[in-house]
From Swiss-Prot:
Binding of Zn(2+), residues: 114, 118, 124
Keyword ATP-binding: no
Function statement: Single strand-specific metallo-endoribonuclease involved in late-stage 70S ribosome quality control and in maturation of the 3' terminus of the 16S rRNA.
Predominant localisation class: cytoplasm
Annotated family: Belongs to the endoribonuclease YbeY family.
Highest taxon of source: Bacteria
Enzyme class, broadest EC rank: hydrolase
Protein name (database record): Endoribonuclease YbeY
MF terms in GO: metalloendopeptidase activity; RNA endonuclease activity; zinc ion binding
CC cofactor note: Binds 1 zinc ion.
HAMAP family: Endoribonucl_YbeY
Organism: Edwardsiella ictaluri (strain 93-146)
Source lineage: Bacteria, Pseudomonadati, Pseudomonadota, Gammaproteobacteria, Enterobacterales
One GO term describing the cellular component: cytoplasm
Amino acid sequence: MSNIILDLQLACADLQGLPAEGDFLRWLEAVLPRFRDEAEVTIRLVDEAESHELNLTYRGKDRPTNVLSFPFEAPPGIELPLLGDMVICRQVVEREAQEQNISQLSHWAHMVVHGSLHLLGYDHISDEEAEEMESLEAEIMQVLGYPDPYAAEKESD
């Protein structure tokens, strides 16, 4: 039995073709139990306008993005299973999958894995951090049965 609670919010105009809630839960279950006994996560699926607005407000980037992660920080001394929120932009994920010639489901999985690691405190600002995070992502994606999302980059190095 999973100790992960998922609040999946569908804020897209078109809900056709989105992964099922069970897919999102399976992807979270591949990441979170490695680090926490229990976790509560919100995943909000949005259109480009909302992603753009949030990316501009919180990151100063004037464009929509694939995934934004907002870790929950409990006040000192308070233990809560709340991990945080992820906001994933449907159009960006679908466009990137097409541009990278990968399956949409694989790219959705990668965005959930990537966003989950951000919620857990991982980042990719420095090369060292990026290498650690990308290695974890590749390992988790393989466990899920998907290809290494960074394979093309590694081949070109």
